Regions:
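Post-Walker A helix-loop "phosphate-sensing" segment adjacent to the P-loop in P-loop NTPases
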Residues: 42-52
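Conserved nucleotide-sensing/catalytic segment adjacent to the nucleotide-binding pocket
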Residues: 52-54, 61-110, 127
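Glycine-rich phosphate-binding loop used to anchor ATP phosphates in small-molecule kinases
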Residues: 88-147, 194-211
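Walker A (P-loop) phosphate-binding loop of P-loop NTPases
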Residues: 30
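Extreme N-terminal, non-catalytic leader segments
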Residues: 1-24, 52
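Conserved lysine of the Walker
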Residues: 33
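Conserved NTP phosphate-binding and transfer environment spanning the P-loop NTPase/kinase superfamily
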Residues: 3, 17, 138-292
Length: 292
């Protein structure tokens, strides 16, 4: 079903290629939006288009200009952390067929760099794919007429219920995805991820969910078998959370939740282009540190 839906979205974009030039993809944490963007890119190529992907990370303002949270940490999630004016200027120029040198953000120095970057010129009807948490917010692309934009909201809407009265919370399913991914590719313990989760949720409530209605289409990345594939990683991680920390209660609740599922007999049955591979590894779309 997911493959069919991606093909339908790509087909719509291809049929309206003269107008729909800027493809904006957004969604909450661990919704699978990065893998979705890659799969959409491949499908558009199959249809004869040559999509170009642009990372919003390269439009971060210099670190010294980045807003801070009340706690004093750099707030990379707020819209003000991006140079929105420069992003609009570059996107507008590219869509007009002009040559643009795109910035590259150096995370070590905390500064944008242009030196060594090759000028980019897009062909007529060549779409741009942009994936990021602010993709649905009109303020991000205010200079681009709405008719040139196609906005996609990616979420993981769980399709299973525990029983007739208790559904599986979508937020819990995403949290389990994130627990596994952060451990697999960032070496983060379950405790660390659980501690970060309230801040992640706060960012979603502020920067993502208010703009859902802006989307032209919604893509559901949930899979009926995913919790069976994730639990073999999640259970030992959650069992390591000790009773002396506040996050213990949430860990136990997620553990109880995992007990409703059996392990997937053979993980190799998960296709290497599956969105689930973004979390458990061996995705055809990611190589080593690219998955971090």
């Amino acid at each position: 079903m997911q493959e069919k839906h991606i093909a339908e979205i790509a087909d719509y974009i291809a049929k309206h290629r003269q107008k729909l030039r800027l493809i904006l993809i957004a969604g909450p944490s661990s919704s699978g939006k990065t893998s979705f963007a890659q799969r959409l890119r491949v499908q558009l190529q199959v249809m004869g288009l040559r999509p170009f992907s642009i990372s919003l990370d390269n439009y971060f303002v210099n670190r010294e200009d980045t807003p801070k949270t009340p706690a004093g940490a750099y707030d990379y999630e707020c819209l003000e952390a991006l140079d929105v004016d420069l992003f609009n200027k570059d996107m507008f120029a590219l869509l007009k067929g002009e040559s643009v040198v795109l910035p590259r953000y150096n995370f070590k120095t905390g500064e944008r760099e242009w030196e060594g970057q090759t000028p980019l010129t897009l062909e007529k009807s060549q779409p741009i794919i942009v994936e990021g948490i602010h993709g649905l917010n009109e303020k991000l692309t205010a200079a681009i007429p709405r008719e040139y934009k196609f906005k996609i909201y990616v979420s993981a809407l769980t399709q299973l219920n525990i029983d007739a009265h208790n559904r599986i919370p979508t937020t819990d399913a995403r949290l389990i995805r994130r627990l596994v991914r952060d451990y697999q590719f960032r070496g983060a313990s379950a405790l660390k991820t659980l501690k970060q989760w309230p801040d992640v949720r706060q960012g979603e409530e502020k920067y993502i969910f208010p703009y859902q209605e802006e989307a032209d289409v919604m893509f559901n990345s949930a899979m009926i078998y995913e919790l069976s594939a994730l639990r073999r990683y999640a259970v030992p991680m959650l069992e390591a959370v000790t009773p002396d920390v506040p996050e213990y209660t949430k860990a136990r609740r997620l553990l109880d939740f995992c007990q409703y599922f059996l392990d997937l007999p053979d993980e190799e049955d998960v296709p290497n282009n599956s969105i689930l591979r973004e979390f458990i590894g061996k995705s055809v779309f990611f190589k080593g540190e690219d998955q971090v």
